Design a protein with these regions (language model features):
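Pre-Walker A adenine-sensing motif
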Residues: 2-16
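Hydrophobic anchor at the beta1->P-loop junction of P-loop NTPases
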Residues: 23
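Conserved lysine of the Walker
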Residues: 31
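Hydrophobic positions on the alpha1 helix immediately C-terminal to the Walker A/P-loop
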Residues: 34, 38
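Short glycine-rich substrate-engagement loop in P-loop NTPases that contacts/grips substrate
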Residues: 54-84
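Interdomain motor-coupling "hinge/lid" segment immediately C-terminal to the ATP-binding subdomain
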Residues: 119-121, 126-230
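Accessory nucleic acid-recognition modules appended to NTPase machines
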Residues: 183-343
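Catalytic cores of nucleic-acid endonucleases
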Residues: 326, 350-395
Length: 403
């Protein structure tokens, strides 16, 4: 287990506060491990094991507690004889019907500190806004960053170079459990395929009552094949029609929304750089873990430019940036990244091997006249910065948390 200190730094200030700590993210990205890390810190601070009460609602042992009243009554009964603050941990809380009512009641009745995890973005919508508005703080957990991957991979293969680690990261992605499989090719592929199936069936099909699973599969395949490219539900509808299937554009949009709610894909809006407004159409999608894409659909090395974009995009989210795609007339900037009063522009490419590529990637910035930092990221080893535009190796960018 690695410490995932970047997340602990964010969570630590809220430990022992009366705000409910909500950890969200794709299934198997490490949310349960984060709960374990929090428990470890509490025990080191002198909290007794009896004060820590945990429930994992994927465990059939807790099936009888999957409604709000039963869970509430169980916890009240279990804590009656305890003194001092109680620490409550609920893993995959979305399995509990009306869980918001239970959590809010416990927050009021008990001297407690509450942590919950969930694998669906809808966790923070609907009735939650009524019961816990202003009383929770959310932390989105992602699969391993490249820096975390290096830390973990070197416990398995000590002294592996950063470049060799990156080759492994490109192939396997960042799902934490792969380390337990020693990054064995066949075992990892099987595991990632199973994670994908679990997300599809539990977090998309079942949660959204989707009946046409075959159509969902086609949409998932289409999005995965076209990550980092302009998405249009109308175009997808026409594509499906050419395949002998028919689906209304609105239904396609609902299916895609179900996929983003399950954190399988992330939607990125386009921003008009001149008008400084987000555009309502022609967004892009990136996959939560590029290793899942390779295991299920294949083709990552064939689409290396898009996979590198995907890796950089997820890293920007980890660092707390709000990310959009920049549109300037007919030109497009890969990422506009904003955080508080900080703003940077990023172009991502595989290699700056040809003069045409260099002119294209650096030339995008010619018409942007503000003074915010502008980056071109590639796998080239030599610094090719020019005209105030910073060139950086992608590996160096991923391991430089100061950006």
């Amino acid at each position: 287990m690695i410490k995932r200190e970047s997340y602990m730094k964010k969570i630590r200030p809220f430990i022992n506060s009366d705000l409910v700590k909500v950890l969200t993210g794709i299934r198997r990205c490490g949310k349960s491990v984060m709960l374990d890390l929090i428990k470890q810190e509490l025990l080191q601070q002198g909290v007794t094991p009896q004060q820590l009460i945990s429930y994992n609602f994927e465990n059939m042992s807790f099936a009888r507690l999957c409604n709000a009243q039963a869970l509430h009554d169980e916890i009240i009964s279990q804590t009656q004889a305890l003194t001092g603050k109680i620490y409550l941990f609920f893993d995959e809380i979305q399995e509990v019907k009306d869980w918001e009512k239970c959590i809010n009641s416990l927050r009021i009745e008990l001297n407690c500190d509450i942590y919950i995890t969930g694998s669906n973005a809808k966790l923070l919508s609907g009735e939650l806004a009524t019961y816990l508005a202003g009383r929770y703080v959310e932390f989105v957990i992602y699969p391993f960053s490249f820096s975390e991957f290096i830390e973990l991979y070197n416990t398995i293969q000590p002294n592996t170079s950063e470049a060799d680690c990156f080759k492994k990261y490109l192939h396997f992605g960042g799902m934490p459990y792969l380390a337990a499989l020693q990054y064995n090719e066949a075992a990892c592929k099987q595991y990632l395929q199973d994670v994908y199936t679990s997300v599809e069936l539990k977090d998309i099909v079942r949660r959204n009552n989707i009946r046409d699973v075959d159509m969902l599969e086609r949409i998932l395949t289409y999005i995965a094949a076209n990550i980092g490219t302009i998405f249009s539900a109308n175009v997808l509808s026409k594509y499906l029609k050419s395949e002998g299937r028919s689906m209304a554009t609105e239904t396609i949009i609902n299916y895609v929304k179900a996929c983003t709610d399950a954190f399988l894909f992330y939607q990125v809006k386009r921003q008009d750089i001149q008008g400084k407004k987000l555009l309502a159409i022609n967004e892009k999608y990136y996959v939560a873990d590029h290793g899942i894409r390779e295991a299920v659909f294949g083709g990552n090395m064939k689409d290396i430019n898009l996979i590198l974009e995907n890796i950089v995009y997820l890293e920007l989210l980890r660092r707390g940036y709000k990310v959009s795609i920049g549109k300037l007339d007919t030109k497009e900037i890969d990422f506009i990244c904003e955080k508080q009063d900080k703003k940077i522009y990023i172009q991502v490419t595989y290699l700056l091997a040809a003069e045409e590529t260099i002119q294209r990637e650096f030339g995008f910035y010619n018409e942007i006249t503000d003074n915010y930092p502008k980056y071109v990221l590639s796998l080239d080893e030599f610094d090719m910065s020019r005209n105030g535009i910073i060139h950086k190796n992608i590996r160096d960018f991923l391991t430089d948390a100061s950006i």
